C-alpha cells in the first residue's frame, strides 16, 4: 500500500540522515534500514493474517503491540527459527517502534501502562538474546583468558 510505503520512506530518512534531532544515536547504513523494513513487513503481514489488522506503522502505537510481538516471536520459534534470528527481528521492530514513538501520536492507553509496549518489546529482545549470550559466554571467557595471558 502507498501509505505504508510512505511511512517506511520516512523511517528510512529518520534512520539514515546524519543529523536528526528526533533520533537518539548515530545514523545507520541503508542495509540496516532495509533489514528493519523487511522485518516490519513480515510482522505486519503476520498481524494481517492472524489478527486481521490493516498493515501500517500505527500498530506500533497500540497498547497490544508487545503482546503481538510476543505471539510473533513464539510463532517464529515454533517454526524452528533460531533465537539469534528472533532477537534480530525483535531489534528491528524495536527500532521502528522507537521511530513511531518519536514521530507519531502514541495511544494514551499505551503511554499509561506501567511499562510501555516499547519497553516490553525491548525485554522480549533481551530474553531471546540471553540464551545465545549464555551459550557464548564460556567461549568469550576463554578467548579473553587466552588474550589476557598472551600479553
For each predicted feature, which ranges?
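Charge-rich, intrinsically disordered N-terminal extensions
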Residues: 1-151
